[in-house]
Structures are given as structure tokens and as C-alpha cells.
Amino acid sequence: MMERMNPQRPPSLDELKRLAPTLQSLAAAYGGRELRVFGSVARGGAQPASDLDLLVDFPGSPSLEQFMDLKLALEDLLNVRVDLVTRKGLRAELRERIEREAVPLA
């Protein structure tokens, strides 16, 4: 059984990279692929109260149930609040910055 992350802080980028195979398998179980980290964790500036910003691709459009189930499964595994967004769901004014800073978990 995998040890849970400290609930007082989001996992570091290095921790997420070590967990990448598990995280990508989890995303695939809900129809997602290509998980990428952006935001404060990707920039190395996460604080104890920060959430974890993840970008995920879905071939086609995920159902609300698929999307929420993946979000909740990631939160349960990592024991941290996850802000999960899809590429298609990114607001146009944020898309370029987020895609530029997003770090693949592969």
C-alpha cells in the first residue's frame, strides 16, 4: 500500500515525478492521459496551504462523473486539495501561460 502524502503541504515536483507511473495509471483508469503539473508546485513556490494544480487531457469530452471521480481519486491518493483542469477547459487568457509552465508527469 502506498504511503499517503503529508496533508499539511502539497507534494513537491520530485515527489510527483516519483509517483508518475501511479498517477498516470490512475488518470487512465478514468479515461484521462498526460497529467501535467502547473502553478506553484511546478514553479517551486508551493506553500503549506497551496493546492496542487494538474492539467489532464481526455480524448473527447469526459463526463462530469469521470472528471470528478479522477479529481477525488487524486485527492485521496495524495491527501491534498487538487485543482484539476482539462486543456479544453482552460480559459483562453490563461491557456498560454499554463501550457508553458506545465511539467509533464511521465
Model-derived regions: residue spans:
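Helical scaffold of the NTase/Pol beta-like nucleotidyltransferase catalytic core
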Residues: 1-35
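Metal-dependent nucleotidyltransferase catalytic core
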Residues: 8-10, 19, 58-89
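Short connector loops at helix/strand junctions that flank enzyme active sites
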Residues: 30, 47-51, 77
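Conserved beta-strand core positions
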Residues: 35, 52-54, 82
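Catalytic metal-binding acidic patch
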Residues: 39, 44-63
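Short, charged recognition helix plus adjacent turn
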Residues: 93-97
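Short hydrophobic/aromatic patches at helix-to-coil boundaries
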Residues: 100-106
